[in-house]
Structures are given as C-alpha cells and as structure tokens.
C-alpha cells in the first residue's frame, strides 16, 4: 500500500499526476512524437512512467518493452530486448565451428563465424530499420545512468529518425536531470519530436491523497495534524510520504491501534 522503495505499477495504488498522465498519453498518441520525462530523484518519475505506459498500451494496443538502465549499459544494450522482438539477438557475437582430426600431423581445425551485429547495432539508422515497423512502446527508465554522452546522442538521433518516418515504434525516456539537455546530450534537432516534461514536486493535496488512499486500505486513520506533519516533512516528494506513512502504519499495527496522530508520526521518524 505504502511503497517507498519500489515504483508503483498498479493503477489502483497510484495517486495524483492526472495532468501529467494525460499529457504523456496525448503526446505518445500523436504521430511522430516521443516523450522525455525528467526531474529530481524521489518525485515519482518511474511510478508515473509505469502507469502512463500501462494506460497507453491498453488504448493504442501496443506491446510494451521496459529497459531499466544501469551504468554498464550502452546504446546497443538499451535496444537489446526490443530487437529480440524482431528475432535479432545481439548477445550472440560469434559462433565457433571446430573439428578434430589428424592427417600426418595436421590436427584440430577451428574457425569463427561472426554474425556482424556488434558493429551494426552501434548505428542509429540500422536500429531504426529493424524497429520502425513494430507497434511497440519502449520505456527507457533511469536513462541518467548511461555514462557515455555519445550513447545518449545516438538515442536522440534514433528518436528523430523514428519521428521523421512517423514510425509506430515509440520511445519514452525517463531520467534524473535538471534539464532535458542533460539526457539528450544537447542534440540540436530532437526538441521538435521529443516532448520534454519536467516532473515537479507534488502538491499537498496530492500527498494527502496518498495518505488517505493507503490508510483506507489498511483501515487506519491518520489525524489531520498527522497528515499535515507528514506533508511538511515530505516537502513535495512522494517517496518520503510513502516512507513516513509506512513507518507510522507499522507502529500502529504493532501497537494494535487504528488512529495515528502527530506523536505517532514523530515516533516513526
């Protein structure tokens, strides 16, 4: 119910961000348009992306591929799962063909046959040709983890290629950043086809909605002062609202009480 440590992926647990969800759906349903969602850590980017993506695949009948990036990822590995849908496995770099025989001192013979994917998969235009006809949404989360600026630039270049051809393959990029340029490596012409959405902190009303929704499911009651205390401590970050509410609820359940007041919140902290 209160999930501070994992992004929300169930619609019935998601609260707030109605405007942003509608904005994302409208953009991804627009021909040639893709989405870049960015903002501070803890504002709920991944949860919003999960819910918006889930809604889109229901509305548009698209397949969903999710890639959560790590520091070891590169341009090619970002699209590995999407390419698998085309029957292309870039993890197979080569195969060895070996035989064993002996004729007058001539022994084992071995040759290597290269598939050639590893060079091609570095090219945005090659990736584009393989993916352009897929009716798929690729959600690229934690894109800020990508270390190489050239890899980020290639992703932006691929998005432009997809946009120019009005491809049904859509890309939804999510990452921690102060500006969109940090995630696109300053690609000069991607702005017209990549809707940039900066996710700001949540309003107090949205944070209270998180508390009310969770407490109703747990059959607990947070007092008015307790809610305002949690909101003040959260400073607009839903991560902290979930965390403090979770710890307060755990304390109430342990103590076998249903009402949570400001003292219980302070004790949970």
Kindly label every feature range from the protein language model.
Residues 1-14:
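Conserved adenine-nucleotide phosphate-binding loops and their immediately adjacent elements
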Residues 12-24:
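N-terminal pre-P-loop "Q-motif" helix
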Residues 17, 46, 237:
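Short, conserved phosphate/pyrophosphate- and ester-handling motifs at nucleotide-, phospho-/glycolipid
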Residues 22, 26-153, 167-169, 177-179:
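P-loop NTPase nucleotide-binding core
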Residues 158-169:
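Substrate-engagement module of ASCE P-loop NTPases
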Residues 179-194:
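Short regulatory helix/loop adjacent to the ATP-binding pocket of P-loop NTPases
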Residues 199-227, 236-244:
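Conserved small helical "lid"/interfacial subdomain of P-loop NTPases
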Residues 224-269:
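Amphipathic alpha-helical "lid/sensor" segments that cap RecA-like P-loop NTPase cores
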């Amino acid at each position: 119910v209160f999930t501070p440590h994992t992004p929300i992926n169930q619609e019935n647990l998601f609260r707030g961000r109605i405007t942003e969800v509608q904005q994302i759906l409208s953009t991804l349903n627009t021909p040639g348009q893709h989405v870049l969602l960015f903002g501070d850590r803890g504002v709920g980017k991944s949860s919003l992306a999960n819910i918006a993506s889930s809604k889109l695949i229901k509305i548009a009948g698209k397949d969903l591929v999710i890639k959560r990036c790590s520091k070891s990822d590169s341009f090619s590995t970002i699209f590995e799962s999407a390419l698998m849908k085309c029957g292309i496995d870039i993890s197979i770099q080569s195969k060895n063909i070996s035989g064993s025989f002996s004729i007058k001192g001539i022994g084992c013979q071995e040759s290597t046959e290269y598939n050639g994917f590893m060079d091609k998969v570095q090219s945005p235009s090659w990736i584009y040709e393989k993916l352009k006809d897929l009716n798929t949404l690729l959600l690229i989360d934690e894109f800020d983890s990508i270390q190489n600026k050239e890899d980020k630039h290639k992703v932006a270049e691929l998005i432009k290629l997809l946009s120019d051809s009005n491809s049904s393959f859509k890309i939804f990029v999510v990452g921690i950043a102060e500006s969109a340029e940090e995630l696109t490596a300053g690609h000069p012409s991607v702005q017209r086809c990549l809707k940039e959405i900066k996710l700001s902190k949540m309003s107090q009303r949205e944070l209270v909605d998180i508390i009310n929704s969770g407490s109703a499911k747990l059959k607990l009651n947070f007092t008015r002062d307790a809610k305002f205390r949690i909101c003040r401590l959260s400073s607009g970050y839903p991560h902290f609202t979930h965390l403090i509410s979770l710890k307060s609820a755990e304390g109430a359940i342990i103590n076998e009480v249903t009402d949570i007041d400001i003292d219980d919140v302070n004790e949970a902290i």
